[in-house]
Amino acid sequence: LDLAARGTVTAVADSLPRDVLLRHDDYDDKFDPHVWMTPDLWMLVVQNVRDALIVARPDSAEVFRANAEAHLAELADLSTYTARILSTVPTESRVLVTAHDAFNYFGAAYGFDVLGIQGISTESEAGLRRISDLVDVLVNRDVQAVFVESSVSDRNIRALIEGAAARGHKVVVGGELFSDAMGEDGSYEGTYVGMIDHNATTIARALGGDASIDGMNGRLNG
């Protein structure tokens, strides 16, 4: 799909400071693209979107500035909430095991060790060795919960749970996270704020933290 042929295209994440971006073993010359996983980084992206829109439509500059200001305030509240509830997860429980490697920015921001079964792309495949190594982590670090993702098959997560069970260690699915897709259109979880609220609340509750099942705004479906 050639988006540039249909109009102006701005890669809004390209202008993020390089010192906040994470490299990944899957890509020698590119950065981990999942910058939306923390509100603080996404606030920088919103500012870039605002500026790009103003350049494209200077006649609507005041509207873009006002909308961005309102959304940035909402993201600031989300950032505060997310940091607060995740800080209640016991240090020894801060191991986040997910279907694919999408949560490295999350881990860096909130002090979690992040382990994805698949690589950074949902199209990559996990080998038996990778699953075996992760079973070792679950057992040795007494990990109690792992997480499926809405956009990735749960097959490998189930294999992890079964592998741990075979070694006498019980692991449960802590919940479903949104990584490369948000919730259903029209739902709270189908918005950026709702997606991050859902992820942070789900992780905190599953790993022993203190968070209301209703989330930041009392709007999560639970």
Task: For the regions a language model picked out, list residue spans one by one.
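Extracytoplasmic metal-acquisition and chelation regions
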Residues: 1-222
